[in-house]
Amino acid sequence: MERKLYLELCQRHATKGGVLVEYDGVAYQPYAYELKFQPDGKIKHTAILKEPKANCLVYCRLEDVKEK
């Protein structure tokens, strides 16, 4: 998923709720975004997803997240 779209979904979920994305075949709420630099200087984009039933956070690669 593109970063801009994911950030828009995070904002929409924070203000209105009810937004879901899919990761590994499971529906999650978009919660936050994290940008890190790896030792080789490359950027790592991380999506932070919230599992609504278990109330836990899942950290995954942004490119593996799909719009639901």
Predicted features along the sequence, with ranges:
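Mixed-charge, Lys/Arg-rich low-complexity intrinsically disordered regions
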Residues: 1-15
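Mixed-charge, Lys/Arg-enriched low-complexity segments
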Residues: 3-6, 63-68
